[in-house]
Amino acid sequence: RFKKIRRLGALPGLTSKRPRSGSDLQNPLRSGKKSQYRIRLEEKQKLRFHYGLTERQLLRYVHIARKAKGSTGQVLLQLLEMRLDNILFRLGMASTIPGARQLVNHRHILVNGRIVDIPSYRCKPRDIITTKDKQRSKALIQNFIASSPHEELPNHLTIDSFQYKGLVNQIIDSKWIGLKIN
C-alpha cells in the first residue's frame, strides 16, 4: 500500500498517511520528461487504487461514462463517487474505502431499510444510509465517527451522527471530489 502511495502521491481513500517529501524520493532514474502514456497510466492507477477497483470494473465504469451525456471524465468521477463504499468513507463512517467495503460486505449497512452487501451499489439521491440495529454494528460506526477528524462534509451528503444515519441529497458536484486527476 505504501509503495503505491509513494509512487502515485496521496490517495486519501486508501490511507490517511501522506508520502514523505524529501531526498529519499528523488530517484534519478524516475526524473525526466514523462511520456503521455505514462501520465495516462498513472492517472488510471490513481483512480483504481483510490476507489479499490479492478481493471475490469474500471473499464465498465468508463464504458458507462462514455455512453452518458456530458464530459466522460466528470461522469466517470460522479459514478465512482456515488458508490456505497465511497459514500460511507465521505460520511466518516469508515476511515478508508477498504474499511467501508468491509462494513458493507459484513452486512452492517442498510440502504433505505434494506441490507446491502455489495460495496459497488450505486446510491441515488434521497437514499438513506443507516447501520443495523445490532449493538456491534453501531459500536463499529461510533468508533469510526469518533476517531475520524471532522472534515467538511460534501454538499451532496448529510449525516446525523447520533442516529448513525446518512442521507444522499443529490449527485455529487465535481468540486468536492478529493482526488487530483489530470
Swiss-Prot record:
Record-linked Gene3D superfamilies: Ribosomal Protein S4 Delta 41, Chain A, domain 1 (1.10.1050.10), RNA-binding S4 domain (3.10.290.10)
Intracellular or extracellular location(s): Plastid, Chloroplast
GO molecular function: rRNA binding; structural constituent of ribosome
Any one Gene Ontology BP term: translation
Keywords of this entry: Chloroplast, Plastid, Ribonucleoprotein, Ribosomal protein, RNA-binding, rRNA-binding
One cellular component term from this protein's GO annotations in UniProt: small ribosomal subunit
S4 RNA-binding domain mapped to chain residues: 82-143
Principal subcellular localization: plastid
Assembly notes: Part of the 30S ribosomal subunit. Contacts protein S5. The interaction surface between S4 and S5 is involved in control of translational fidelity.
HAMAP family per UniProt: Ribosomal_uS4_B (MF_01306_B)
NCBIfam families in the cross-refs: PRK05327.1, rpsD_bact
Protein's name in the database: Small ribosomal subunit protein uS4c
Native source species: Nerine bowdenii
